[in-house]
Amino acid sequence: MANTKSAEKRHRQSLKRRARNVTVRGEVKTAVKSAREALGSKDGAKMTDAIKSAAKALSKAATKGVLHKRTASRRISRLAKAATKAARAQA
């Protein structure tokens, strides 16, 4: 347990940050999962909307510092690549 006032404060801060990070990570996970599911569907508009919302969630998480900038960029890139592949398969 924390022995000093500053350590207690840092612990409180870390708990707040952890709660915030868990929420943001959950939102990102949900957005990416729905985008992956949309890739399997035949609806092109649904697919592009899902990819856009996932990319937005990933970018926001990177801006907030929850995800590293390059991690978010890599995930967005992979989603876009999968979307292109799915679009070609449908055509």
Swiss-Prot record:
Keywords (A to Z) from UniProt: Ribonucleoprotein, Ribosomal protein, RNA-binding, rRNA-binding
GO molecular function: small ribosomal subunit rRNA binding; structural constituent of ribosome
Composition-biased stretches (Basic residues): 8-20
InterPro entries from the UniProt entry: Ribosomal_bS20 (IPR002583), Ribosomal_bS20_sf (IPR036510)
GO BP of this protein: translation
Region (Disordered): 1-25
Gene Ontology CC terms: cytosol; small ribosomal subunit
Role according to the record: Binds directly to 16S ribosomal RNA.
Sequence similarity: Belongs to the bacterial ribosomal protein bS20 family.
PANTHER family: 30S RIBOSOMAL PROTEIN S20 (PTHR33398), SMALL RIBOSOMAL SUBUNIT PROTEIN BS20C (PTHR33398:SF1)
Record's protein name: Small ribosomal subunit protein bS20
